[in-house]
Amino acid sequence: MPHFMLLLHSDPSGLQQLSPEEMQKALEKFMAWRNKPITRDGHRLTDDPGRVMRSQAGQIRTTDGPYSETKEILGGYYTIEAASYDDAVRLAQDHPTLEYGGTIEVRQVWGT
């Protein structure tokens, strides 16, 4: 069965505004989703903007972030099994990232 990456984009300050009780409830939702049978792998990423590496004129350049003008960052990922893109999108519709204002990019893993 094909594998798909769910790339989770969100504004990290959104979850930080939750009360401790709301944060616990959110964490439980994320963990429940991670434990679904379709999920093969998944992790949260740190809130820092990371680094972007580019080759320019034969030299490797490293910059902070991917985009300094946006608040949304790549905050995590999941690898899931699904029959098709449509199936992967349907399965991702109840992911808590969407509930908390984030977006999900769905991409098929090459060779699966």
Language-model region placement:
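Conserved, structured core segments of small domains
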Residues: M1-T112
